[in-house]
Amino acid sequence: MGSGEEPSQMRRALVDSLAGAISGGISRTVTSPLDVIKIRFQVQLEPTTSWGILRRDIYGPSKYTGLLQATKDILREEGLPGFWRGNVPALLMYMPYTAIQFTVLHKLKTFASGSSKTEDHLHLSPYLSYVSGALAGCAATIGSYPFDLLRTILASQGEPKIYPNMRSAFVDIIKTRGVQGLYSGLSPTLVEIIPYAGLQFGSYDTFKRSMMTWNRYKYSHLNFGSEDDSVSSFQLFLCGFAAGTFSKAACHPLDVVKKRFQIEGLKRHPRYGARIESSTYKGMYHALKEIVAKEGFGGLYKGLFPSLVKSAPAGAVTFVAYEYISDWIGSKAGVE
């Protein structure tokens, strides 16, 4: 590698990191209310639908029984700040997560394509896009995981709070689980993130290529003027929206298992239902079997609706913001 290429690659990595961090922060803050509701559903052992009210003799009373009911309950009991509970560790997690993810992704695509230009990366095979996305997701997860754990713990509690702030949750985890407790649930998280990140980035590239093909066809066959395959902001939004929906729907059961491992054995106010005791789940496969046995197959899809309502726009906002911020910073820094 020539010495002239190194500063350029360093600038490119800085652009990717900064654009990824900013886009991740915007996306996470905008969609935090839906993320809080999703997490409350995922860690609730009792049914999360109105059907649970009719079967409370079997399962016990359910705290949350639907998206609208949960929204009203959180607003009444915790006020508007309740919808941003855990947002500080979420930002501390998601900003470095997206920074690492987009930086590693660009590096992998540059290596695979032999070019650092983004437009050349679209010519990679779908298989390489999926693999690059999965590897980038793994690197980002390992680098930011303790904040993901703290986000889940703070977002899952309501009022009265068990942990008043991030520091108290951190201290209690160290005290009860040791330093390794900060990585509780990392294995199922990696099992989840490999297909999730692979599908998210792979499908985004696939949708974007399809959109460019449609644009070329539209301009050449439908008399729209000169040929142009550039993708508009709205089309980028649609690609991100579709990628977010597809990847989240496919991997949601693994996300439920991950959340259960993260709060296993931690304190929980009785108002929010049964506590998940330590060593309830002996492994990922055992957790899947236990959830199905005790909660039915629907237990694996708790929080799916708020998750999809959140993930689709979150994916769209992240990708669109990244594309534009990356282009803007790159133009200022003289990076292609």
Curated annotation (Swiss-Prot):
Spans traversing the lipid bilayer: 11-27, 88-105, 127-150, 182-199, 230-246, 303-322
GO cellular component terms given for this protein: mitochondrial inner membrane; mitochondrion
Keywords: Membrane, Mitochondrion, Mitochondrion inner membrane, Repeat, Transmembrane, Transmembrane helix, Transport
Entry comment describing in which tissues the protein is expressed: Ubiquitous.
Chief location of this protein within or outside the cell: mitochondrion
Solcar repeat extents: 11-111, 124-210, 231-328
GO molecular function, one term: thiamine transmembrane transporter activity
GO terms for biological process, alphabetical: thiamine pyrophosphate transmembrane transport
Domain of life from the UniProt record: Eukaryota
Membrane topology: Multi-pass membrane protein
Subcellular locations according to the entry: Mitochondrion inner membrane
Family according to the record: Belongs to the mitochondrial carrier (TC 2.A.29) family.
Family annotation (PANTHER family): SOLUTE CARRIER FAMILY 25
Chain's role: Mitochondrial transporter that mediates uptake of thiamine diphosphate (ThDP) into mitochondria.
Protein name stated in the entry: Mitochondrial thiamine diphosphate carrier 2
Organism: Zea mays (Maize)
